[in-house]
Amino acid sequence: MDKINPDWAKDIPCRNITIYGYCKKEKEGCPFKHSDNTTATTINDVPPPIDVGEATTPTMTSVPKFNAKVSASFTPMTVGSDSLTTVTNTTSAATNATGNIAMAATSATASTVNPMINPIVNSSLVNNNNNNSNISISIPTTASSSNYDPFNAPIFTPSSTSSIHTNANAHSFPFPSIANSGGININATDDNSNNMSMANNVPPPMQPPPIESSNLKYPRIYPPPHSLLQYHLYAPEQPSSLKSLLKPNERSADQLFIPNNIREDLTKKNLSILQVFPSSGKVIPSIVQDYFNLVPLNFNNNDFLNKTTLFKVFSNYDGKAYVLKRLPNIDKSMNPNKISKIYQIWSKINCTNLIKFRDIFQTTKFGDLSICLVFDYYPNSLSLYDYHFVNFPKFPITNNYLWIYLVQLTNVINSIHSQNLSIGNTLNWRKVLITGDPGRIKLSHCNFMDLLFNDDTDTVVSSGGSTIEGQQQLDYKYLGELLFNLSINIENSNNNTAPKEYRLEEITPQSIDDMRQIDDKFKDVLKYLISDNGDSKKSIHDLTSHFYDKMFMVLESSQTYTEYMESVLSRELENGRLFRLVNKLNCIFGRIESRIDINWSESGTKFPIILFYDYVFHQVDSNGKPIMDLTHVLRCLNKLDAGIQEKLMLVTPDELNCIIISYKELKDLIESTFRSITQ
């Protein structure tokens, strides 16, 4: 190979720079050109004018290449006193030039492009009365870089000033103001620039109003808003006025999938379960005992660390989500045997209307000696008070709701009293949670505090003592107080009026008779619950004798809802079957090895699979426009999965050849092809 002439190659860019970003032969005598801008340019050196009407195309040599091997990690620029420079026109000839573009550099010498530096180009548009235009573009010098802390960064506040300025000291887009920086204020309003832009009929761009940074208090909860599940982007159901009448054997597309309300509810619950709270471990510990990823559920309290708090946690044993209730500042002299006895007693209770108690332990992870109680987690659950009086949209209280609540709470009392325990004053409308429809409720927790701080635990759980029997009799009164407060606020649940809460000593038989919103049978139940029977004691048997007929109504509604959910699951089961069939088709269709296999050619045995795939998923109308018919897809996949003897005609894209084949033959061909891949 002949030697390269250095005089001829010195003006030709090196190909290694273009391809790789660098040339390893540069220091060994590579004769080609390795740097583009080696000449010095001063501020007074004005390049030759460029005709605006003439189109210019940049060459490959003028475009810098990114070198990933020598580039450093991204470091944001900080605004300093030397970060911006003001460019002024030094000659009157440049200002009076018509249709010329002047490029001014801020440094004495122009260097090659460094990927570590991201210069901000600031442009100012000036139009004078003589219709002479001069577009001046300035590139600021490299600002001093510093370490960026995302947790201590100021909240972004958009600027309300115009982004078109004649002063080069202002950026063309807003920045958060930096106090005590010693540099210029890039959010300051330039009166001269605003007046000039208005004088030349340059309308300022529309920008959002300024937002006070002190009012932006968002909890840093993962996932961020941009990765939330977009359940609301599904197509809504058609209104009843637009739905066509279907025959008994016909189905619409909405009837083939899960209903929208159930899908959205389950999606929101899954999102609540999967949310985590990235904490530094200073305020909220990362791991407590066998639980991790603590997410506060009541972090709106002012005194967060000194109050009873609830956390959503994940277990190391099974990976499921639970609720951890922390009781702070516990006496160090507490007997550990008392804690173990509480767990042994309450963990035996299995009631569908009582949240299951899972674990109890002591910990010092919160900076003090705390007792933690672990329960099952029900996402997006609301208390009776929030469900009917606070949450939007409100669900009004009806007589059917009252009977449903009474039956379920009676079941809780029966389960707890059968274990020789009592509920206590936790039986109120802020401790009873709505976990689902129709009116399914669960009692959150019972009197653990009394058991923990009672000096004599044996008297609380004794079977023959008067203490436990007296507390069980109080449970009936607490139930009557809860139902009375719900009944008397039926009208308040339909409007925005605040609910009235009555104490037990304020409820009288006369106040029950004065209520017109409930029937007489429910009034008899309330009178029985709040009355003092003297020597005779209340019991579950006597209580249920007042509304045994209503228990059948609750049982019937529960059975109906169970059958409805089973029908929904059966439809999803069919959809899962079709999903597996689509996976099989995608596994065998379009593989690289099939391009050279003669069996996949037009004369091959597996060519009908290609035609069937196009027939199902690549539909076109008579004009060749792509269309999507979900009914056609489901019908073909169901016939293929059943393997019926019905035949169909598959046509090639050029419409020159066709194949007549049955769904059974197609199914056998797909199954054999899939087995040949997996084996």
UniProtKB/Swiss-Prot annotation:
Gene Ontology annotations for the cellular component aspect, listed alphabetically: cytoplasm; P-body; PAN complex
Region (Knob domain): 588-679
Principal location class: cytoplasm
Protein keywords: ATP-binding, Coiled coil, Cytoplasm, Metal-binding, mRNA processing, Nucleotide-binding, Phosphoprotein, Zinc, Zinc-finger
Post-translational modification: Phosphorylated by the cyclin-CDK complex PCL1-PHO85.
Motif PABPC-interacting motif-2 (PAM-2), residue range(s) on this chain: 143-163
Gene Ontology BP terms: DNA repair; mRNA processing; nuclear-transcribed mRNA poly(A) tail shortening; postreplication repair
Modified residues (Phosphothreonine): 57
Modified residues (Phosphoserine): 252
Coiled-coil region: 549-587
Subcellular localization, as worded in the UniProt entry: Cytoplasm
Residues that, per the record, bind ATP: 325, 376-383, 430-431
Zinc finger (C3H1-type): 8-37
Family label: Belongs to the protein kinase superfamily. PAN3 family.
HAMAP family referenced in this protein's UniProt entry, alphabetically: PAN3 (MF_03181)
Record's miscellaneous remark: Present with 1600 molecules/cell in log phase SD medium.
Function description: Regulatory subunit of the poly(A)-nuclease (PAN) deadenylation complex, one of two cytoplasmic mRNA deadenylases involved in mRNA turnover. PAN specifically shortens poly(A) tails of RNA and the activity is stimulated by poly(A)-binding protein PAB1. PAN deadenylation is followed by rapid degradation of the shortened mRNA tails by the CCR4-NOT complex. Deadenylated mRNAs are then degraded by two alternative mechanisms, namely exosome-mediated 3'-5' exonucleolytic degradation, or deadenylation-dependent mRNA decaping by DCP1-DCP2 and subsequent 5'-3' exonucleolytic degradation by XRN1.
Record remark: domains: The N-terminal zinc finger binds to poly(A) RNA. Contains a pseudokinase domain. The protein kinase domain is predicted to be catalytically inactive because some of the residues important for catalytic activity are substituted and it lacks the equivalent of the binding site for a peptide substrate. However, it has retained an ATP-binding site and ATP-binding is required for mRNA degradation, stimulating the activity of the PAN2 nuclease in vitro.
Complex and partners: Homodimer. Forms a heterotrimer with a catalytic subunit PAN2 to form the poly(A)-nuclease (PAN) deadenylation complex. Interacts (via PAM-2 motif) with poly(A)-binding protein PAB1 (via PABC domain), conferring substrate specificity of the enzyme complex.
Protein name according to UniProt: PAN2-PAN3 deadenylation complex subunit PAN3
